[in-house]
């Protein structure tokens, strides 16, 4: 696990929940994260990550939340605020525009070796999905993570990945929170304690040029 983070054959991007419903101005959840998205210029930075990954031939693994469809949460006994909000808003509705990946961030499976993993139900893109299996099949050891939301799905996935033995880098301006304060608390206070590296997108892309 000592190879540099930018070692392309052993490194992958994990991009979490880049759905229209989250990061497009017309998305169902956009209003909840718009302040933080604007403050961090998140969408531009996510596109910068994808562009840099393509140029460096680093595969992107897409960790996506389960799409909503009628009956998804029927008889669930352990709903939390997140699942309740998704149920009531019908965010990421199956087959809808909102459940599509934002234009410019779409996977390139054949050209870049990107992988769309099975969808997560709660916060971690590892729990109840095939992400770990897919990474092991390709002998990936280093993960660079970005996406939504800073202190929920992104952070939870990073924590889980670290527990599984991956070298994890988090990109501070490739994400957003339900408020700028919540996002900043995650990136400034929590992340440095739980992962291997915390960087801006610009700092990370600079390492690819060295």
State where each predicted segment sits.
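A short alpha/beta connector and helix-capping loop motif
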Residues: 9-11, 26-53, 57-62
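Active-site-adjacent betaalpha module
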Residues: 1-12, 21, 48-56, 73-74, ...
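Short connector loops/turns at beta-strand edges and beta->alpha or beta->beta junctions
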Residues: 18-23, 28
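Catalytic-core segment of enzymes that process non-peptidic bonds
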Residues: 62-71, 77
